[in-house]
């Protein structure tokens, strides 16, 4: 019996490590469907708190990914007895290495910048981290519903309704008449006002 679950790719491994709240949100999705308002309040609060902590946890989790992903890749390839099972983990390892290198370059380059420039950059980074954390929580807490295509008959009825409503005159304006008029009648209508 084939599995219907989509395989987890390398970027998903990386994002699941760096944003652990998205894994938790996907587990809590059925409960969030029952209580959407409470879930939104909790998700907003969690996104704000975790977003502020992202400036500290992001580099730490990227460094942890340099050790965790190769080990998971080796174990996965040994369990499945094929080498392509570890390709997602290798990509996640390179993403962790690249992210950590960008963070180190950013910190080293901040030494040469003026404090008036560094503090707004930190503020923008915190805002982006909070926004991304809220986005990750929300998209995994409330997954998109599958859209079923409607029948051609319903689409045809909808388009005919739209064409009828767009060609109808605006009856709220008293100067517009619903009957076709001659040029003399239209001039007499303007003379009244």
Curated annotation (Swiss-Prot):
Pfam family, one: DUF5422
TM stretches of this protein: 40-56, 63-79, 86-110, 117-138
Location of region: Disordered: 158-193
Keyword Glycosyltransferase: no
Keywords tagged on the record: Cell membrane, Membrane, Transmembrane, Transmembrane helix
Primary localisation category: membrane
GO CC term, one of those recorded: plasma membrane
Membrane disposition: Multi-pass membrane protein
Localization of this protein: Cell membrane
Family membership: Belongs to the chlamydial CPn_0442/CT_006/TC_0274 family.
Name of protein: Uncharacterized protein TC_0274
Source organism: Chlamydia muridarum (strain MoPn / Nigg)
């Amino acid at each position: 019996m084939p599995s219907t679950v989509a395989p987890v790719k390398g970027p998903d491994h990386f994002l699941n490590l760096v944003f652990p709240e998205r894994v938790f949100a996907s587990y809590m999705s059925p409960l969030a469907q029952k209580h959407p308002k409470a879930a939104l309040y909790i998700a907003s609060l969690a996104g704000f708190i975790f977003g502020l902590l992202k400036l500290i946890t992001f580099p730490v989790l990227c460094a942890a990914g340099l050790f965790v992903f190769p080990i998971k890749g080796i174990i996965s390839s040994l369990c499945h007895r094929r080498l392509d099972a570890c390709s997602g983990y290798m990509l996640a390892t390179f993403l962790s290495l690249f992210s950590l290198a960008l963070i180190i370059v950013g910190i080293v380059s901040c030494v040469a910048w003026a404090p008036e420039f560094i503090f707004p950059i930190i503020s923008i980074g915190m805002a982006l981290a909070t926004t991304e954390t809220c986005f990750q929580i929300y998209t995994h807490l409330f997954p998109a519903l599958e859209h079923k295509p409607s029948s051609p008959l319903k689409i045809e009825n909808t388009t005919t309704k739209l064409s009828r409503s767009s060609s109808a005159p605006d009856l709220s304006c008293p100067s517009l008449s619903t009957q076709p008029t001659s040029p003399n009648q239209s001039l007499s209508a303007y003379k009244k006002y």
